[in-house]
């Protein structure tokens, strides 16, 4: 008896169009993203299009926001990959509802609205709070180095800049002298009205390179002046007034090894856990206790985590009107000023004084009273039990971002844009996490 197969007619047209939403099973992340965005306040996104005089109608912002959030929540960050997914992936096609924006359109929309995703990030955290999923009483703070959209090979040290500046100045001067000699010869042969081709390409290339190096050198010097001023050093001082030892360099003069990147000048060389020293930004987040949702996020161009904890707590209070009662943080966030501020704010802090596994760290109560108090607290059994929760609370979201989503490098350049993209990443992670918690 012949086998009877199920009907298969790929060329058969449909008499009536199907509901695209039925292509995906109930509880799919795309459904959750679509429903959530429909309830969001997207006024800031629409406001940018009012009265801009466009001839061609732009794509609906709701659709673009859905595509970006779902894309980041599923590990698709590139505008080209997003555009390809809109043609090939069922979930993306359902969210876009028959729209196919190009990768340039997606990239421009993201660039144009990076600053607006902070509001959506805060709004989603508020939704989680109202639903009882997230509470802001106990937070864990952590940071991670995320690669900048720039190569460290495009960076140059201050010492090398000075050498290159001197070399290029000599070469430009020699080329200018040669060009003037040629001009004089041509004037004699063809007359002064003769017009050549302008600056020779060889001279133009060197002049452009010299201008870039001078700009980078000026950025490093401005950064160093700012740093010296913050430490109380004044121009003309040759010795440290506190210790009397002579300074190794003039005020405002960077160290020879200080570097600046030509592609993304605001990024910095930072040590990563796996890839050695890379061009990076320092991405910080504050995580809610049980749900492990991200409730505050920030990006810094400083490699150190010190000074990052209190701004995150203030961001939570500013956005949600509540001050956390407890905060957990690792040794990277420990400094006397921040620990003292926690006490002033009435926040019960558990911040390690040294790296885990290195034994207890002693603190001089006379010089560092806040550190000494913290050391005493962490020496108790209750203090150790509280701090032990930090690892699985704070480090899990960073692991999800880097391993599950695969976000290890910013797609944009500049500190402000990096902050906007980090907000989008944390927003997407929260949406994915909330969908999972709802299903559970």
Language-model features: where?
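Anion-binding and metal-coordination hotspots
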Residues: 1, 7, 68, 75-88, ...
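Hydrophobic alpha-helical membrane-insertion signals
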Residues: 1-31
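Basic, short loop/linker segments at the boundary and entry of helix-turn-helix/winged-helix-like folds
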Residues: 24-69, 74
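Secretory-pathway/luminal and periplasmic proteins that interact with or process carbohydrate-rich
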Residues: 92-97
